[in-house]
Each structure stands twice: as structure tokens, then as C-alpha cells.
């Protein structure tokens, strides 16, 4: 049996023909491997083989890893730093070894908080972190501050306390260390004469990852802070605190719902139709469905309500959504949304639950500022008290603000009537809203004349016209006679925080509302590619799901990014996203190509 046949017998898959996808993956994997140091050395050795004439013709490269280092030093303008590390044989990136008493810096500070100047600890521990400052006191004593897990500790390295053969070894180990380097050091806890908890090194520090690019003391330029977010996080504590607050808020939301017996679920991001909100979707395609246009979800609402139909009476989801719309201080095309649906809940219960949630989050944020997130700026947020949560009804409040009596907003020509009334009062909407649907026009009027009242206290705007909430139950308002929805929006400090309503569970009424929505979009010329209000069609699949019976259900949605903005006191949505807005992310890619 030949060796090849033997291999086939043992490993038949080696000789199986590859598909196109597998071939492409193999090429990618081969290319990725080729940049490793081991592969470079192997290829270099082959290039020297006398029988490899094809490779022999290639320019001779002694070590491609060195070439990569040379390219880095040129592009980063830090050749001197790299040469110094080479000189001290410190340009290394070693693997970490297991240590029985490795501690995080926060745990070290907590464990040894009672150590005194006269009674240092005897237990040896290993700390790892990034050098934020380093200073020498003569040639026998060096101090450094290392940070990790958002806390710092001082390390004292004395020639008299570490095992070295001679002072030159002490110098050669410490001399190449700079701010930004990542090190590990073993020692015992002590407190200095000034009362500072420190680690007294019993071994010389080991360099785990040198910082070959200079680490600034501070970043101020906003564009640079976003484009170099990793540096911003290292030098600006407030940036990290905002992102950490985001994590705490999401955890608080999850705990809040779990404590109330909600089930967390995940619903599709990609489907053949994006419904659940009035927004233009991102459209794409998939190789499995070459002739079908797909869309990224704009909201998880319709999926979640299908689960309620299926008997999951309390569900919630926290996840991404995508809307192909404008980008400004409070909007980003990619954002995080939280929605919950609770069977047998009405609008008043949803509003009460919202108030409880926001109050709890405010208190939680204050405690975090006092304990873990000291740089948060939440002082300007007016604290809601028991009696200052206001409620206004949409139609009466807007009529008072405009000084007009709104037409019957259910009439087919309501849009034209409203435009004529606004023209008579010299309150025509801006040019960009010409041709907008009645829904968008009413939304603009509310944002201009009603939402500002939330600057001094939280404001619920309730009972929007039915045309503004086609997925909500509707009823005739006894006060105005208008057909309105069982809906409320919460605004705090001028920002929309949450949207909630009693869900339409009548399949026949839901179909009628979908059809009216389609007609409205066609009338305003916004149907085509989705316009500003998204795709318009009757979602037959959802209507059929309702035919199996959706119990009376309350639904609620909140933009997590805006919630973090509110609680952190940040003015821009980019500040609460790990790498800024979509504009920042795209700019980052463009800068990398230059």
C-alpha cells in the first residue's frame, strides 16, 4: 500500500474535493497564518533552499517579523522606543504563567485595606496592570503606579528588597519601562509613611506587553478621542465610567424584569420585512435567498407579541435595532432597544411600572457615582419627586399650544385641513416636512410644542391620535371626540425615554389599520423604498398570528442609549457607544486605510 493510499484510508477527508466556500476559507486561513512569526521563519528558511529556484528569485528577507517592526516604528514615529526595547532585550510578548496568589488590583486594595505602617502583610501576591506613572528616587528605589480594573496601586521597588546579582541588573530591568507598559510584579502589601497602601516588590517586575506608541497624559480633541477610543479609555476616566454605567444600567433592567417574572428572549434581526415602527430599514440580501430582499429589524415588537400569543405572557428583549435614518446628537442608525410585553396589563399599569423603573435607576446611578463611577456628571438632572410626574393629553395640549381646534384626524382629508389651519396661524412646518404624512406632521408639532415641558419635570404625553400608533388599541376620546390610542410617551429633560401602549389584539381591526397606513404612505409619496416611515404593507403573517388570540397586552419600549445619556449627563449619543456613532466608526475605517 502506498503512503498516499494509507493516508486516504486513515484520513479520507484530506482528499475530498473542496467546495467554493471551503476553498475561500482555506485561502484566508493560509494567508492569516503567513503573518505569524513561526510561518515567517519557515518561509524564510525555504527561500534559502538551493533547489527552490522560484523562491530563490525573490528578494532576500532575513526576518519578516523585523520588517513588520520596522514598518510599525516608521508609521508610529517611535523608532527610538523600539530600538531601546531591543537594546535591553525587552521587545517581548511572553505568555503568562499560572500563579497561585494572583490578585486584581481592586481585590488587593480591599484585602489589605487594614494594613498599617507598623504592621505590613507577609503574604506574597502577584499584581498585573498598566504603568500609569514611574519615578525614581535615586538609583536604588523606583516607584510606579499601575492600574487595572479601573483602580490604581503604588508599587515600591527597592534594590535592597529584590533578588539581583548586582545593581546593573536592577537598572537594566527597570530602565526600559515606561508609562503605558503592562507588567506583572510580586510583593507584599505595606503602607508608606504618608499612609498610601502599596505593594513592596520582592521580585523585579516582568514586562508582559510593552507600549511602543507614546501614551498621552490626556486627550481633549473630540475627534481624536473617538478615533482612538482605546487611548481615550486609558487616559480619560470619565469615558470609561460612562461605558461602565451603560453596563450597570443594562444589568439593572434585566434584574428589574427578572424580579417580575419576565422571560428574556432573542428575536430575529434579519427577515424579509421590517415592521413594528415607523422607520426606514436597512435592506440587504443573503446568498441563500438570491432573489429576495431582506431587512434588518427596526424593532422586535411583532416577534415579541407572537411569543405572547404562544403563551409566554411576560417577555422582554434587550438588543440591537437598525434604522436607516439621520444621524445627530440623539440618533444613531444602530442602537440598542429594550422592549417588554405583559399580558393583561393596561396603560396605567405600564406608566406606573415606568415610573418605578426610572426612579430606581436614578437612585442606582447616584449610588454608583458615590462608589464606583466618581466622574459621572448627573447633577443637572432634575430629580423626580412623588408629585411632579406630569401627564398631558396629546390633542387638548396641542390645541392649547397652537391656538387652534384640530380637525377630525380620522377624516381622509385631515392632513390637508391641518395644513390649512397651520397656514392661517403662520405655523407651517419646515420645508423638509412638505409632503410628509399626517403622522410625521403631528409628531413634529408635538416635538416643537409639547416635549419641551419635560425640561423641569418628567412628562407623560398620552392618548396620541390613532393614526400615530397603528399597533395600539384605539378609542373615542370623551373629551375631544377624536379617535385616539391607548398610548403614552415619557419625556425627561427634553428627551423621549419610553413609549408604551395597550396592544391592538383584534386581527380585523389590525388589518384595517395596516391598510390605512399603506394608504397614508401612498398619499404622502413615502411608500417607495420605505421613505422616512419605512416599508408600508399589511403584515399578513402577523395578522394571522393574532387570529389565534393575543390576550389584552401592554407593550413598552425604551432606547437604552438615550437612557444612558440621561443618567450619565452626556449630551451626545456617541458618548455612550463604545466606538461612537456610525459616522465615527466609518471615519475610523477610512483613517486606517490612509
Q: Where does each model-flagged region fall?
A:
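Class II aminoacyl-tRNA synthetase catalytic cores and aaRS-like
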Residues: 2-594
Amino acid at each position: 500500500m502506498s503512503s498516499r493510499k494509507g493516508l486516504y484510508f486513515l484520513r479520507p477527508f484530506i482528499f475530498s474535493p473542496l467546495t467554493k466556500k471551503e476553498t475561500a476559507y482555506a485561502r484566508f486561513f493560509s494567508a492569516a497564518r503567513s503573518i505569524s512569526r513561526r510561518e515567517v521563519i519557515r518561509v524564510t528558511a525555504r527561500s534559502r533552499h538551493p533547489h527552490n529556484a522560484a523562491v530563490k528569485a525573490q528578494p532576500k528577507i532575513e526576518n519578516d517579523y523585523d520588517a513588520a517592526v520596522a514598518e510599525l516604528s516608521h508609521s508610529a514615529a517611535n523608532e527610538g522606543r523600539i530600538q531601546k526595547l531591543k537594546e535591553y532585550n525587552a521587545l517581548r510578548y511572553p505568555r503568562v504563567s499560572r500563579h497561585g496568589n494572583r490578585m486584581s488590583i481592586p481585590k488587593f486594595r480591599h484585602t489589605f485595606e487594614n494594613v498599617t505602617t507598623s504592621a505590613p502583610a507577609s503574604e506574597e501576591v502577584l499584581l498585573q496592570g498598566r504603568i500609569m506613572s514611574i519615578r525614581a528616587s535615586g538609583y536604588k528605589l523606583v516607584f510606579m503606579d499601575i492600574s487595572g480594573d479601573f483602580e490604581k496601586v503604588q508599587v515600591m521597588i527597592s534594590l535592597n528588597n529584590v533578588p539581583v546579582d548586582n545593581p546593573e541588573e536592577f537598572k537594566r530591568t527597570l530602565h526600559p519601562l515606561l508609562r503605558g507598559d503592562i507588567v506583572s510584579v510580586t510583593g507584599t502589601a505595606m503602607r508608606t509613611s504618608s499612609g498610601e497602601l502599596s505593594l513592596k516588590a520582592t521580585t523585579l517586575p516582568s514586562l508582559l506587553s510593552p507600549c511602543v506608541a507614546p501614551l498621552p497624559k490626556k486627550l481633549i480633541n473630540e475627534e481624536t478621542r473617538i478615533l482612538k477610543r482605546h487611548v481615550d479609555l486609558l487616559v480619560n476616566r470619565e469615558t470609561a465610567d460612562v461605558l461602565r454605567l451603560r453596563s450597570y444600567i443594562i444589568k439593572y433592567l434585566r434584574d428589574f424584569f427578572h424580579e417580575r417574572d419576565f422571560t428574556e428572549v432573542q428575536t430575529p434581526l434579519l427577515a424579509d420585512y421590517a415592521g413594528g415602527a415607523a422607520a426606514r430599514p436597512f435592506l440587504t440580501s443573503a446568498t441563500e435567498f438570491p432573489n429576495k430582499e431582506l431587512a434588518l429589524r427596526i424593532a422586535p415588537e411583532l416577534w415579541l407579541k407572537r411569543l405572547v400569543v404562544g403563551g409566554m405572557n411576560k417577555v422582554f428583549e434587550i438588543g440591537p435595532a437598525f434604522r436607516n435614518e439621520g444621524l445627530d446628537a440623539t440618533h444613531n442608525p444602530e442602537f440598542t432597544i429594550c422592549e417588554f410585553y405583559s399580558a393583561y396589563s393596561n396603560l396605567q399599569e405600564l406608566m406606573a411600572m415606568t415610573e418605578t423603573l426610572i426612579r430606581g435607576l436614578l437612585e442606582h446611578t447616584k449610588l454608583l457615582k458615590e462608589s464606583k463611577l466618581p466622574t459621572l456628571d448627573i447633577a443637572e438632572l432634575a430629580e423626580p419627586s412623588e408629585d411632579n410626574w406630569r401627564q398631558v393629553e396629546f390633542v387638548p395640549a396641542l390645541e392649547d399650544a397652537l391656538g387652534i381646534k384640530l380637525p377630525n384626524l380620522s377624516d381622509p382629508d385631515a392632513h390637508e385641513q391641518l395644513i390649512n389651519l397651520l397656514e392661517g396661524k403662520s405655523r407651517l412646518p419646515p420645508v423638509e416636512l412638505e409632503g410628509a404624512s399626517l403622522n410625521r406632521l403631528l409628531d413634529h408639532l408635538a416635538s416643537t410644542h409639547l416635549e419641551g415641558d419635560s425640561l423641569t419635570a418628567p412628562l407623560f404625553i398620552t392618548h396620541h391620535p390613532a393614526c400615530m400608533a397603528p399597533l395600539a388599541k384605539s378609542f373615542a376620546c370623551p373629551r375631544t371626540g377624536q379617535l385616539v390610542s391607548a398610548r403614552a410617551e415619557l419625556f425627561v429633560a427634553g428627551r423621549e425615554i419610553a413609549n408604551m401602549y395597550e396592544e391592538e389584539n383584534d386581527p380585523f381591526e389590525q388589518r384595517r389599520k395596516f391598510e390605512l397606513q399603506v394608504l397614508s404612505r401612498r398619499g404622502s409619496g413615502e411608500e417607495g423604498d420605505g421613505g422616512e416611515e419605512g416599508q408600508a404593507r399589511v403584515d399578513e403573517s402577523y395578522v394571522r398570528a393574532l387570529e389565534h388570540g393575543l390576550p389584552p397586552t401592554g407593550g413598552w419600549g425604551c432606547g437604552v442609549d438615550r437612557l444612558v445619556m440621561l443618567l450619565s449627563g452626556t449630551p451626545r449619543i456617541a458618548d455612550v457607544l463604545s466606538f461612537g456613532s456610525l459616522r465615527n466608526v466609518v471615519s475610523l475605517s477610512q483613517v486606517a486605510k490612509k
